């Protein structure tokens, strides 16, 4: 063989090999950085996300279980494409939540996930990873009226634990080499399906059924987390999101809910959903189409709640679903987005993820609460770009491209919380009056109530004539930890209609205020914030005794 021919053949082979390698689709799965970022760092970097709703979470009829082909398009949406994810990234979103209903495909008593499902989910995850985006991967409609692969009650606890251990072991193994950009979410809106309190319950006085459900949800979060950690690799320190009952603010604020124990430090994130204000954002029967100042109360209360129990204790929060249904009121939804995301931007450890189900057109009355399309998945055009640009101005100042037009950058907001004394939460998430009387914008600060011992009580009165709120702070000024505390207020001075973050009892002529389990202990210099709300009139000061 002539040397020149040999060289030519070698060159030809190498060229062909090069062309072949270059033809292989590049999928960036970064494991180099591992999962060495804390939950606070990850959530701070996430900031704003978008849901691929009604896609991989779509499910078919239970009589066809187990499905042997994907139901991704079963609810009428097109299959997710990389082009769609590219457009979402261009608009400024850096987080994608991928809801997946795994159970409908599982086989055997050990709930095996078929390869065709896992491969497709991985493909969509990689669409996001190559865009340098965060991904939230969850177990979605595995509890509903058609499928109940888990149920939060003691009667179904054993099989539910088995389900979570199995699917999360499989999912975690498949993605164990992905870096911190992949976040797992144990469950979506776990609840008692069909129960009278499926979607709401009084947080300070839950029924026995709800108490049992909350305890089971705590257990399922722990089982799922343990299964993920046991797979090792990057999963040993991967960030994991966990919800409370129905992922609502009531579900995480009720006294029985707790974050799971974790072998990794600082890797847990609270998952909560908030379509608020409810009458504006989600309601279909009684609803309002205008977002005015009176509706800001629900949003303020929501963040103040989160701050009191989680954010102030260095537990970051992802609002995994939020949106306001399209009631043919784009200008009002722009106001809503401006206030909601502006409020979130005060906290460095909160990320917001917009729900999108690809349904846009409402009826003529605007009464449908499920119209949450922001980008048309067929045309890849944003439907109400002014809403998206309004959201982005509160994120990080990075220019975004929406429908081919670059949106100018804005000054980055200060992520530091500016409201250390939170406005209270209305314990009823479905208020009778959608236009509540606003709180006096100029509240009356009152000097601290002098007390003996280690604790000091401070309060501020918000008085609007027909009602009032008293925001109370109890602080430990001693050098020792205080376990348990009690406050008393005379009934002659206040009439308490509702409260938040505390328990209220009556004793003769006094209201007796005691803490929840999670805020009963105060370290030196620590404090706890809570409040009471009443109707009628109130003076300029009240006498609070601390015991």
Curated annotation (Swiss-Prot):
Amino acid composition bias (Pro residues), ranges on this chain: 414-448
Region named Disordered: 398-450
GO MF assignments: beta-glucosidase activity; cellulase activity; polysaccharide binding
Domain (CBM2) ranges: 448-547
Source organism, top-level taxon: Bacteria
Family annotation (Pfam families): CBM_2, Cellulase
EC id: 3.2.1.4
GO cellular component terms listed in the entry, alphabetical order: cell surface; extracellular region
Gene (UniProt): end1
Sorted UniProt keywords: Carbohydrate metabolism, Cellulose degradation, Glycosidase, Hydrolase, Polysaccharide degradation
GO-annotated biological processes: cellulose catabolic process
Active site positions: 189 (proton donor), 321 (nucleophile)
Family membership: Belongs to the glycosyl hydrolase 5 (cellulase A) family.
Name of protein: Endoglucanase 1
TM ranges: none
């Amino acid at each position: 063989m002539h040397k020149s021919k040999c060289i030519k053949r070698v060159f030809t082979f190498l060229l062909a090999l090069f062309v072949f390698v270059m033809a292989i689709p590049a999928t960036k799965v970064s494991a180099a950085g591992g999962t060495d970022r804390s939950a606070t760092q990850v959530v701070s970097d996430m900031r704003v996300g978008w849901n691929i709703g009604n896609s991989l979470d779509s499910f078919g009829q239970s009589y066809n279980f187990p499905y042997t082909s994907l139901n991704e398009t079963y609810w009428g949406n097109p299959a997710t494409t990389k082009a769609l994810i590219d457009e979402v990234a261009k608009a400024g979103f850096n987080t994608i939540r991928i809801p997946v209903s795994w159970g409908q495909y599982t086989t055997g008593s050990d709930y095996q996930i078929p390869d065709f499902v896992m491969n497709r989910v991985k493909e969509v995850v990689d669409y996001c990873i190559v865009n340098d985006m965060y991904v939230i991967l969850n177990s979605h409609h595995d509890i509903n009226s058609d499928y109940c692969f888990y149920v939060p009650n003691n009667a179904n606890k054993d099989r539910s634990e088995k389900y979570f251990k199995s699917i999360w072991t499989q999912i975690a193994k498949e993605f164990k080499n992905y870096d911190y950009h992949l976040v797992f979410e144990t469950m979506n809106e776990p609840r008692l399906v069909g129960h009278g309190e499926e979607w709401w319950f009084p947080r300070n006085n839950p029924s026995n059924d709800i108490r049992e459900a909350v305890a089971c949800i705590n257990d399922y979060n722990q089982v799922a987390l343990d299964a993920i950690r046991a797979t090792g690799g990057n999963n040993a320190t991967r960030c994991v999101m966990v919800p409370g009952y129905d992922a609502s603010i009531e579900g995480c604020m009720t006294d029985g809910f707790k974050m799971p124990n974790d072998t990794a430090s600082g890797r847990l994130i609270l998952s909560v959903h908030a379509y608020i204000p409810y009458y504006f954002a989600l309601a279909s029967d009684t609803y309002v189409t205008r977002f005015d100042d009176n509706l800001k109360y629900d949003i303020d209360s929501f963040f103040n709640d989160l701050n009191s129990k989680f954010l102030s204790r260095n537990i970051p929060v992802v609002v995994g679903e939020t949106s306001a249904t399209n009631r043919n009121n784009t200008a009002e939804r722009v106001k809503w987005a401006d206030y909601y995301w502006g409020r979130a931007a005060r906290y460095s450890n909160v990320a917001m993820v917009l729900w999108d189900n690809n349904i846009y057109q409402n009826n003529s009355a605007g009464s449908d609460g499920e119209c949450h399309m922001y980008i048309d998945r067929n045309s890849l055009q944003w439907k109400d770009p002014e809403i998206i640009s309004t959201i982005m101005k509160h994120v990080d100042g990075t220019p975004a491209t929406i429908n081919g037009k670059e949106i100018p950058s804005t000054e980055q907001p200060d992520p530091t919380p500016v409201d250390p004394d939170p406005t209270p939460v209305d314990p009823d998430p479905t208020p009778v009056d959608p236009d509540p009387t606003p709180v006096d914008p100029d509240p009356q600060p009152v000097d601290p109530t002098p007390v003996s011992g280690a604790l000091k009580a401070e309060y501020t009165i918000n008085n609007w004539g027909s009602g009032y709120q008293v925001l109370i702070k109890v602080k430990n000024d001693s050098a020792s930890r205080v376990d348990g505390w009690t406050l008393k207020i005379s009934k002659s001075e206040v009439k308490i209609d509702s409260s938040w973050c505390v328990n209220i009892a009556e004793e003769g002529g006094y209201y007796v205020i005691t803490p929840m389990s999670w805020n009963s202990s105060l370290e030196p210099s620590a404090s706890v914030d809570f409040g009471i709300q009443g109707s009628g009139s109130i003076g300029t000061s009240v006498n609070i005794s601390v015991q």
